[in-house]
Amino acid sequence: MAKAAVTKRHHFMIQKLLILLSYGYTNGLDDAHSLRCNLTIKDPTPADPLWYEAKCFVGEILILHLSNINKTMTSGDPGETANATEVKKCLTQPLKNLCQKLRNKVSNTKVDTHKTNGYPHLQVTMIYPQSQGRTPSATWEFNISDSYFFTFYTENMSWRSANDESGVIMNKWKDDGEFVKQLKFLIHECSQKMDEFLKQSKEKPRSTSRSPSITQLTSTSPLPPPSHSTSKKGFISVGLIFISLLFAFAFAM
């Protein structure tokens, strides 16, 4: 019994390290040269009628904020450029449509209610790095109630889940052709405008601080395909956590 408890603790520790590994890697991708959109889908209540919210950032700058309550576009930059305005116009309707689709999918997804504590709470992060001459691509991270995690890479149209339970849900979502088309369409439709805006943002002085994405601290999604570029900071984080994993496995033996 004691041995089983120790093993369970080791497995829990390893799971947390894997979460940090995902955070460290993705944080290397998520900087002022990337556009990040955080989407939240939840069950509305009479006290809080909010059921969807979408926020898009470049670095620390909020360039777009949408919800079913506040449908106006906002920006954290008083000196907003024409490129920023074009990006917002391009993203607004596709994001609204996607949030409605996500709401329908969550409502029709069977989950363990003990894990989700009722209606599933969905968090989605889209990260679009500046294409720099490559085929425009993005990473979509899905987090259902901090219990089910999977990722979609538009670059090679691949899906990866954190575990078997997440894989069951992921496989149903990936088989929805209309849904996948929406994820791809948003990137294809707005890639040129996003690249122009990111190029302009890259030339501006920026803060070195970063805020984690909506799913980064909880997502256990696997590493992106090797063709994605990473910063030195991302590699350092991966290296340190890999060493920690080795120690964790050693103690678990």
From Swiss-Prot:
Disulfide bonds join C37-C56, C90-C190. GO terms for cellular component: external side of plasma membrane; plasma membrane. Residues 198-230 are annotated as: Disordered. This is Retinoic acid early-inducible protein 1-beta. A lipid is attached at S229 (GPI-anchor amidated serine). Residues 1-28 form the signal peptide. GO terms for molecular function: natural killer cell lectin-like receptor binding. Glycosylated. Residues 211-221 have a biased composition (Low complexity). InterPro entries: MHC_class-I_related (IPR050208), MHC_I-like_Ag-recog_sf (IPR037055), MHC_I/II-like_Ag-recog (IPR011162), RAE-1 (IPR029287). Acts as a ligand for KLRK1. Expressed predominantly in embryonic brain. It is a lipid-anchor; GPI-anchor. SUPFAM superfamilies: MHC antigen-recognition domain. Residues 230-253 form a propeptide. The keyword Iron-sulfur does not apply. It is found in: Cell membrane. PANTHER family: MHC CLASS I-RELATED, RETINOIC ACID EARLY TRANSCRIPT 1E.
